[in-house]
Amino acid sequence: MAGKKEFSVFMHELVPEHRVISEEEKEELLRRYRIRLSQLPQIKASDPAVVELGAKPGDVIEIKRKSPTAGVYLYYRLVVED
């Protein structure tokens, strides 16, 4: 049997760009939108993109999505345990 192929979920054309934001960026995000961390949409720590990023519960992921009408927009999700 040949060696296992490496696969990155980020190489797929339908998967948008993801990144873990810093603590400073997280605080600014919450302040800008006047929300609490618990009010962000959630993403499970077992999500393939989260695993590949090495994010842990409590981190916030910024997702850069493309839109035919809005161009590019940012979406934020809180990493939670399964």
Swiss-Prot record:
Keyword presence, Zinc:
no
Checking Gene3D superfamilies in the record gives:
RPB5-like RNA polymerase subunit
MF (Gene Ontology): DNA binding; DNA-directed RNA polymerase activity
Identify the main location. cytoplasm
Q: Return the InterPro entries for the record.
A: Arch_Rpo5/euc_Rpb5 (IPR014381), RNA_pol_subH/Rpb5_C (IPR000783), RNA_pol_subH/Rpb5_CS (IPR020608), RPB5-like_sf (IPR035913)
Which keywords label this protein?
A: Cytoplasm, DNA-directed RNA polymerase, Nucleotidyltransferase, Transcription, Transferase
> Where do the TM regions start and end?
none
UniProt-listed Pfam families: RNA_pol_Rpb5_C
What SUPFAM superfamilies would the database entry show? RPB5-like RNA polymerase subunit
Q: What is its subcellular localisation?
A: Cytoplasm
State any GO BP term from the record.
Answer: transcription by RNA polymerase II
HAMAP family noted in UniProt? RNApol_Rpo5_RPB5
- Assembly, per entry: Part of the RNA polymerase complex.
Q: Which family does it belong to?
A: Belongs to the archaeal Rpo5/eukaryotic RPB5 RNA polymerase subunit family.
State the protein's purpose: DNA-dependent RNA polymerase (RNAP) catalyzes the transcription of DNA into RNA using the four ribonucleoside triphosphates as substrates.
Protein name in the entry: DNA-directed RNA polymerase subunit Rpo5
